[in-house]
Structure formats: C-alpha cells, structure tokens
Curated annotation (Swiss-Prot):
Gene name for this UniProt entry: VP1
UniProt region (DNA-binding), positions on chain: 1-43
Record bears the keyword DNA-binding: yes
Protein name, UniProt field: Capsid protein
Major site of localization recorded for this protein: host cell
Subunit structure: Homomultimer (Potential). Interacts with Rep; this interaction relocates Rep into the nucleus.
Listed InterPro entries: Capsid_protein
C-alpha cells in the first residue's frame, strides 16, 4: 500500500519507487469526469537520456546500536591548470600544451576528509603542490625529521589532476578533532582515517548539496554545465593504493553489449550506466592475423578508463545538465547557481550502511582499509562540470580550452561550488557494560597480561 500525503490547496502525493509522486486531480470544467491527458512531461523526457537514480528500493537491515552525525560545509574553487617552468619540461612542448575547463567532484568520505585537512603550506592550500616539503626538523635527512616529509618531486611529473578537487577546497567538519594536526600533520592515508574513526565501523551518506556558479567569461557564450550522476559514470574504483604512477592506476573497461573480446579478466564488473563508446579489446589486423578473419575497419586500442576521464560540454548538455552563466552574460541571482542535491547511498541494491573499519580488526593497517574490506573511498555520486564556449576545438565538443601557464601567486578560477554534506557513523557492536566486563575478564585466559 502506497503511502499517501496531502498538502494545502488540494495537492495529493503518493510514495512509490523511492520518491513522492504528485497525483494529478481530475478537472472540474465539465459535468462528467474526464482524465487529464498525459502529455509530454519534462521529468520523463530527461530521464530517457540520463537517469541519475536508476531504480531504488529499501532493504531491511539492522540499524546500528549507536550513531554519530558528521557535517561538512565549505567551498570548492575550480581553477585552471598550471605548468612548472617551461625550460625544464622534457621535449620542449610546453608552449603548445593546452588544458580544458572540466572538473569532476566525487562524493565519498575519503575526499571530504582530505578537503578538511590542515590548512598549511605543506598540506594543500593553493594546490596543487609538486610534493611535500620538510615541515620541521634540524637534520638534513628527510626521514629523520618530524613529520617525516619528502622533497618536491621531479618537475616533469604532474602533481595533480582536476579530479583532486579537495586540493582547491576549504572545508569545515563538525564535530572537530582537536588532535588531528598533531596526529596527522601530513595528508591522511586510509590507515590514518581508519584510526581516526577507530570506534566506528559503519558509515552512510545522508545528503550532499551543491551550488555552482560560473565566475569567468570565455567569449560571448560561456555557460558552465554541471550534471550529478549516481555512483561512477565514467570512472572506476582505484585498486592500486598510493601509486604515483598513473598508468598503473588505469583499469581495462569491461562493458556489456559491445561485442569486444577481452584477453584477460579484469577487476571491474560491467556497468549498465556506461555508454558503449569503445569495446575493451577490439580485434585488429596484426602480422599474425589469419587470412579471412573478419575484423572492424577502424583501428582502435583498448578502452582505458581512469580517474582522469571527464565529460565535454556537449556531452553534459546532451544528458540534460544545468547551465550557469557567468556575470556579464546574465544578472546574478539565486537562479544563477546550478543546484544539485544527492540523498542516500545512490545504490539501487538498497545498501544503506557501508563498512568503515572491518570488524575484528585489532590493528588498523592499509591492508585492512583497502578495498574490498573498507568502503571508505566508495563513490556515491559524481558531479561532472565543463564550461562551454562559442570557439573551441572540434574534438572538444564545445568545451573551453586554455594555454597552460606557469605558477603565479594567484589562482584563476572559472567556477565556484558551495558544498554542504551530512554523513553518519555507526557501530553495531553492543556497548553494554556486562559485555565489556566479560571481555576484560576472559581476554587473557591462559596468558599472562
């Protein structure tokens, strides 16, 4: 039986399939009842191209014994990329390197904790940084200093990508941790996050709100398109932890209904939300191809899906993204912002609570905090952003591009995002005094404490 609700002015609602539906009342214009014709509906039209929540139902799972709510609030600056001194770039192509005004904001607890890290010159403020500098210490060796930091990396290695949105964010967390700076003066790893929340082993996402505003013009027409998607539309989970080599972090896509032939079994499952733009391993003609083998006419390579995959302005617009015009092209008001709201886990399976620290873990290490044991870095939603322009390269599909500049003492942001997020931690273990006393009395049976 569907739940029903009534609001003033005769508006009726019914809860079905995970959301409230507005019931259309019959017209009273005629003597006899006539049902209103179901004409074109904007919501159904948009969902035909991009459904942010494809199906939802709730599963009855036991609630935790104790919970704690944590909140994040802050601002994210979407800035243009920088390049290190051009004279040291290998190959001498620095003068011909361009970047696109695209961004990707992943909603996961790991990156929100990174966004609220300590605001010091060795952490992230102003980002990206080429490496971690020596913060304190009197000896020449970095390993003998506190905190243990390293010198900057080689200037030919990229320091960050637009997917690392937390580097350009100022986020506040409530409740605060007064010992966070002394315990974790550097960037927190998954092991540090597990120790920070060692008393909790479950977490869930309640709600996240985004308000995006375009701040920079690019020609006479330069709106910023933003689209909130469930889960990971174009990305995959990072199975290689703390790897500085980006190529080792890439994964081979396994997409359904493409007709591709995979020569190896990957770690990813097929995702129905992906557009089959490219098969994983298309058969191609090589020196060992037998005569008479039917192959495709177009030569293509393996479909690599990485964290650095973004959507163009035209793609986001075709999927029904909102537009935000910068000041000068439209008067600034509340409607100048693109409003996005994500609620729940965004999981059609209905999994509400996720594992923060696995049960039975006496010593929290990176192996315990890595997938699939811990789901701390699970993406619940992803916000894709791209700025359009009336003059762009053809293969960029209307996306604004720019020439990479050398680092200066100020950042050039083309969009600003206001964020509010609510999460909840849980613990299913029974925190009863008799259980604790029994554990203390039996823990050292047969051993010497």
């Amino acid at each position: 039986m569907a739940r029903r609700a009534r609001r003033p002015r005769g508006r009726f609602y019914a809860f079905r399939r995970g959301r409230w539906h507005h019931l259309k009342r019959l017209r009273r214009r005629y003597k006899f009842r006539h049902r209103r014709r179901q004409r074109y509906r904007r919501r159904a039209f948009r969902k035909a191209f991009h459904n942010p929540r494809p199906g939802t139902y709730s599963v009855r799972l036991p609630n935790p014994q104790s919970t704690m709510t944590i909140r994040f609030q802050g601002v994210i600056f979407l800035t243009e990329g920088l390049i290190l001194p051009k004279n040291s770039t290998a190959g001498g192509y620095a003068d011909h390197m361009y970047g696109a005004r695209v961004a990707k904001i992943s909603v996961n607890l790991k990156e929100f904790l990174l966004a609220s890290m300590n605001l010091t010159y060795v952490s992230k403020i102003g980002g990206p940084i080429a490496g971690e500098l020596i913060a304190d210490g009197s000896k020449s060796q970095a390993a003998e200093n506190w905190p243990n930091c390293w010198l900057p990396l080689d200037n030919n290695v990229p320091s960050a990508t637009p997917s690392a949105w937390w580097r350009w964010a100022l986020m506040m967390m409530q409740p605060t941790d007064s010992c966070r700076f002394f315990n974790h003066p550097k960037q927190m790893t998954l092991q540090d996050m597990g120790r920070m929340f060692g008393g909790w082993h479950l977490f869930r996402h309640i709600e996240t709100r985004f308000q995006l505003l375009a701040t920079k013009n690019e020609g006479s027409f330069s709106p910023v398109a933003s689209l909130l998607s469930q889960g990971e539309y174009l990305t995959r989970r990072d199975d290689v932890k703390y790897s500085s080599d980006h190529q080792n972090r890439w994964r081979k896509g396994e997409q359904p209904m493409t007709g591709g032939i995979a020569y190896a079994t990957g770690k990813m499952r097929p995702d129905e939300q992906q557009y089959p733009a490219m098969p994983p391993d298309p058969p191609i003609i090589t020196s060992t191809t037998a005569q008479g083998t039917q192959v495709r006419c177009m030569y293509s390579t393996q479909a690599w899906w990485s964290w650095d995959t973004y959507m163009s302005f035209a793609t986001l617009t075709a999927l029904g993204a909102q537009w935000s015009f910068p000041p000068g092209q439209r008067s600034v008001s509340r409607r100048s912002f693109n409003h996005h709201k994500a609620r729940g886990a965004g999981d059609p399976k209905g999994q509400r609570w996720h594992t923060l620290v696995p049960l039975g873990t006496e010593t929290i290490t990176d192996s315990y905090m890595g997938a699939p044991a811990s789901e701390l870095d699970t993406n619940f939603f992803t916000l894709y952003v791209a700025q359009g322009t009336n003059k762009s390269q053809q293969y960029k599909f209307g996306t604004a591009t720019y020439a990479l500049k050398e680092p200066v003492m100020k950042s050039d942001s083309w969009a600003v995002v206001r964020v509010q997020s609510v999460w909840q931690l849980g613990n299913r273990q029974r925190p009863y005094p008799w259980d604790v006393n029994w554990a203390n009395s039996t823990m050292y049976w047969g051993t010497q404490p």
